[in-house]
């Protein structure tokens, strides 16, 4: 696997409005540059997090920084540092981890998960969380892929892990043993963790193909936190963030630790429940909440649920995975690339904001490979210190009955090279453009583009039109094979309750608003749009529905 690309951002002059450099044909961040520690300095993410925490909690280190909304358990800034050190010491003494070992984590959200993450980071152990709702076969495949030496689970998820195949077995996070580990004081020799060392293996969503294992280094995540710290704004009281997004997902993984490092409070929910969320917002005076798009849709469609709760503390609602874009990022970029800041940027509908600090980008023509100026659509390429270290292979090693002597994760250099070139540019696979003010617009996934008689049709554009129809609750558009056109746009539509809107009416509605080649040619009515745990539409499942024969061409 290639070494991390710690290239210096170009100093060529660029337009101060758009960030576009006519000489290099690249876009530069218009945000203040975020200071980073020297790349060669050994520094685990844990120590960087606590260095920020010391700056942001000097006035009151006894206040809570982690709260479990389910159990009401609270952890203060002082306790977080103490618990992290104690747990790291206990784990070192009991298991004698080697730097580069991988820990598999299968748990719902709780206040102890960030403690576990930080402890493992300090030991140089690679954190690899997974979705607790995955099936037993899926868990087995992920363990074969990631090659952990230990698993951390709960009494509710332990049955999914074959712990006898792991070198150090399994630790239950809701057991007296774990509680003893975080409370028992101890010391351990400091592990020299390089910033270029892997910190985490996360899985991208896999909405268009097989789930991909993404390796993020300590440097990648440090740069993401540094960018957020540079953009922070002074507050009279700490921000209180309710994280309903799973901690195994990139957003939740980064958010659960970053918010604390920036001086905030993170309130976690072990399982999502709309009324429990409302109570938590009211009880803990939540200011920021991260929600999957379907949750927001549910709140809007069932506004009565919110009655009787004081939600006046809310300042920001964040969402990702589908429309409601206020920011843009990938697992491969440690979470962030661009975001909207301030009321003026937020007024520009459809924009995902300006590039984050220490980020540069270019928009590349799909046919010629030439970098394009503002207002031209092409594939977005990004570069910066937050770009992943690489990908991992999907060998299942079916003939191996044990992982006791297996190495850590296996690099997939070929897959990495197809995503990140020799100059450090990550190909996002997203069709995008910048406007003359340096605001990024994400049009669609390139894999999802429909090729109709040589024209490229973006499903997201048609989905926006469909969802503006008063009788449509949700809609998604996929390509459907056609002998004459190659592919035609097909819509899968969920009617609103009580609606009997007809296919012909929907086709006419769309046809009046788009070019002829973009018209919906085929429609199927379904009960729900398939989505993954983080709210992203599962395109593969949609295509299966489209090809199942339930649709009729009119």
Which residues are covered by each model-predicted region?
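Conserved pre-ATP/AMP-binding loop-to-beta segment of ANL
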Residues: 61-64, 185-203, 209-210, 233-240
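Conserved AMP-binding A3 loop
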Residues: 74-79, 192, 199-226
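Conserved AMP-binding/adenylation subdomain of ANL enzymes
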Residues: 222-240, 248-288, 298, 302-303, ...
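Conserved AMP-binding/adenylate-forming
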Residues: 69-73, 90-134, 243, 456
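Conserved ATP-dependent adenylate/AMP-binding module captured primarily in the ANL superfamily
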Residues: 132-162, 183-184, 224-242, 273-287
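AMP-binding/adenylate-forming catalytic core of the ANL superfamily
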Residues: 134, 151, 289, 384, ...
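Gly/Ser/Thr-rich phosphate-binding loop
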Residues: 261, 286-291, 300-348, 357-360, ...
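N-lobe entry segment of adenylate-forming
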Residues: 1-94, 99, 499, 504, ...
């Amino acid at each position: 696997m290639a070494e991390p690309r710690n290239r210096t951002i170009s100093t060529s002059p660029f337009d101060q409005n758009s960030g576009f450099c006519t000489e290099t044909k690249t876009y530069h961040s218009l945000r203040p540059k975020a200071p980073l520690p020297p790349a060669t300095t050994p520094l685990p993410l844990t120590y960087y997090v606590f260095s920020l925490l010391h700056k942001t909690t000097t006035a009151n280190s006894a206040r809570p920084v982690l709260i479990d909304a389910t159990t009401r358990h609270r952890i203060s800034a002082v306790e977080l540092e103490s618990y992290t050190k104690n747990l790291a010491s206990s784990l070192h003494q009991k298991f004698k981890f080697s730097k580069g070992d991988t820990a598999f984590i299968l748990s719902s959200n709780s206040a102890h998960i960030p403690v576990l993450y930080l402890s493992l980071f300090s030991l140089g152990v690679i954190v690899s969380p997974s979705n607790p709702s995955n099936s037993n076969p899926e868990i087995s495949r992920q363990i074969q892929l990631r090659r952990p030496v230990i698993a951390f689970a709960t009494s509710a998820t332990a049955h999914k892990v074959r712990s006898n195949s792991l070198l150090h077995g399994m630790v239950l996070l809701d057991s007296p043993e774990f509680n003893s580990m975080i409370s028992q004081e101890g010391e351990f020799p400091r592990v020299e963790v390089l910033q270029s060392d892997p910190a985490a293996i996360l899985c991208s969503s896999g909405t268009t193909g097989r789930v991909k294992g993404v390796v993020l280094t300590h440097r990648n995540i440090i740069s993401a936190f540094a960018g957020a710290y540079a953009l922070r704004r002074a507050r009279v009281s700490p921000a209180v963030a309710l994280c309903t997004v799973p901690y195994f997902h990139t957003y939740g993984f980064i958010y659960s630790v970053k918010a604390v490092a920036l001086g905030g409070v993170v309130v976690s929910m072990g399982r999502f429940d709309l009324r429990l969320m409302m109570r938590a917002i009211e009880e803990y005076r939540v200011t920021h909440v991260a929600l999957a798009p379907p949750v927001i849709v549910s709140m809007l469609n069932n506004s009565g649920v919110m009655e009787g709760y004081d939600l006046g503390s809310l300042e920001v609602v964040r969402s990702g995975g589908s429309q409601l874009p206020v920011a843009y990022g990938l697992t491969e970029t440690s979470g962030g690339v661009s975001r909207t800041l301030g009321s003026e940027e937020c007024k520009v509908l459809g924009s995902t904001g300006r590039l984050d600090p220490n980020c540069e980008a270019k928009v590349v023509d799909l046919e010629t490979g030439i970098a394009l100026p503002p207002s031209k659509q092409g594939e977005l390429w990004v570069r910066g210190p937050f770009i992943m270290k690489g990908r991992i292979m999907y060998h299942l090693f079916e003939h191996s009955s044990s992982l006791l002597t297996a190495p850590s994760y296996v690099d997939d250099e070929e897959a990495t090279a197809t995503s990140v070139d020799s100059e450090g540019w990550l190909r996002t696979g997203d069709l995008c453009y910048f406007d003359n003010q340096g605001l990024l617009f994400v049009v669609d996934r390139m894999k999802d583009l429909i090729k109709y008689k040589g024209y490229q049709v973006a499903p997201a554009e048609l989905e926006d039109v469909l969802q503006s129809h008063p009788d449509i609750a949700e809609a998604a558009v996929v390509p459907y094979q056609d002998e004459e056109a190659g592919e035609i746009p097909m819509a899968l539509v969920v009617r609103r309750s009580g609606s009997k809107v007809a296919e012909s009416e929907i086709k006419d509605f769309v046809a009046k608003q788009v070019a002829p080649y973009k018209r919906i040619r085929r429609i199927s009515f379904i009960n729900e749009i398939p989505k993954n745990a983080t709210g992203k539409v599962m395109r593969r499942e949609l295509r299966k529905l489209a090809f199942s024969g339930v649709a009729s061409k009119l």
